[in-house]
Amino acid sequence: MAITWKQFERYWYLFSLAVIIASLPFSKLGLSIGQMMMAGGWIVERFDWRRLIASLHERLTLRSVLNSVPLSFFLLFNGIVTGFKQFAKNRPALIFSSIFLFHILGLFFTTDFDYAFKDLRTKFPILLLPLLLSTSEAIDRKSFYRYMFLFVLAVLVRSGYNTWMISIHHFVDIREVSHNVSHIIFSLLLTLSIYSLLFFIFNRGLLLLWQKGLMLLILTWFIIYIITSQSFTGLSVTLITMLVLIPVLIFKTRNRLMKTILILGILVIITGLFLSLRSFVRNYYHVNPVDFTKLDQKTSRGNPYIHNVASTQTENGNYLWIYIQWDEMRGAWQKRSRISFDSLNKKNETVAFTIVRYLTSKGWRKDADAIERLKPEEVDAIEKGIANYIFRDEFSIRGRIYEFLWGFDNYRETGNPTGSTLMQRFEFWKASVGIISENWITGVGTGDMNLAFKAQYEKMHTKLSPDQRWRSHNQFLSIFIGFGLFGFLWFLFSLCYPPFVLHRFDDYFFLVFLIISVSSMLAGDTIETQTGVSFFAIFYSLFLFTRKEKDPIFHQDI
């Protein structure tokens, strides 16, 4: 069956949108191609072909063909202007895309224009995607669901690929499996997929029973993947989204039984989290008693131990700096590993210190006998920089909490946050506040953020390793640093005004997306990478500007 040109343009737009959504878990190139396809279709759709053809039909000569060239450029320019006029009438989309405008205005306060223009290229989807989606014909609910199924399928395929890669490769950091798409962004995609599946499973009449069973299997797999891939970000954002969403559901539902179940559910979750956390912290700070007056002075091989009884550092309740025999450990380690005892492990941390921590975590003495007792997989773990046997577990909440507490105690004693992800973030935030205090009105501009952080770290005399002196790892602080107080307030307004005026705060998909996005922005620079900004811009625009109908959190009969 033949299709009209208008239908082809529509199909091209829908296909381009599918390419963008399907590329999110896989490819930056796919994202770029999808956006270029959509932009090209958007321009062609507004090009006045009839006027161009009419000018050629009047008199088809070489001169008329040559004259059609400037006419084509005029029609191309006119079509783009027409599209922007449409865009200007859509105030919510225009205000959201104004986030990009602030990055342009930030050029007035910039000295590093190379980085500034790179940042503008990265952030361009914040302008492009709202422009293209808000000025195109909206999609109906059925088509929207198909796009969400496509998204879930893409995340499912990528999670399967990642699992296969994990099984055949030995990653120093398992998060490297998502190297072409940040593991943090992929965890956000996972979380959005999980809550999309929950919507389809619990929405009555939407799917057949066997289809819901299939969705439940995929949901179960995503949860298993989060655990096996050690995606602490994915688990945290999923949990935070639940803790925010449940009170909203409690407020929205008029069903007393449902309200009671939800209240009991959130109380159980919060109580369980509190008790678990308290137990982990107590266990971490529990110290196995030692009589320092009765410490053995020599190893089984007759070499003297070193005992630093003044140090209170522990690992799993065992004192770190007693029963140390460096020469024995060095000699025994060289027989077990190709990495030198006095060099750095694969995390660029001292091998000797990692060995001491690992052996202490098991309650062993630090001598040749202990090194010889290590299993080959434990030697491999130490080479990778794993300093506690608990951290070898595929996923360990206790290990993550111990890692944080260790970093906190070490930071408190030495002032050096290097090696602890959370303590490093505190140092990033401390530097961010310092920069803001000196540039709170205008900010440092679009391109000077790296220079500002470099100067601030020097000013603070930070003990952070030079290769770990990163930016704020908080999107709100990054905006404040770049554009000052007014830019920060406008950023918040740009996020909140569109859903407010469009009455979408009670839309399930947008609310879930907003919670996920804000959660990620509190602990990361979500829109500072191509995949991050594309995730943010495409779903914000899809949920607000592209759908004809919204999906309320609760139907009227619930």
Residue ranges, per PLM feature:
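Membrane-interface micro-motifs in multi-pass membrane enzymes
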Residues: 29-31, 118-122, 177-193, 230-233, ...
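Short, aromatic-rich membrane-interface segments at the entry and exit
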Residues: 13, 28-39, 116-119, 233-235, ...
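Loop-to-helix entry and N-terminal half of a specific, functionally important transmembrane alpha helix
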Residues: 12-20, 94-97, 214, 218, ...
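Transmembrane alpha-helices of multi-pass inner-membrane enzymes
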Residues: 36-46, 242-243, 494, 510-518, ...
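Alpha-helical transmembrane segments of multi-pass inner-membrane proteins
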Residues: 100-108, 128-130, 139-172, 180-359, ...
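N-terminal hydrophobic segments of proteins, predominantly signal-anchor/transmembrane helices
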Residues: 16-25, 37-122, 149-162, 517
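Long extracytoplasmic/lumenal interhelical loops at the membrane interface
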Residues: 344-371, 402-438, 442-483
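Membrane-interface helix-loop-helix junctions at transmembrane boundaries of multi-pass membrane enzymes
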Residues: 3-10, 46-95, 200-216, 249-261, ...
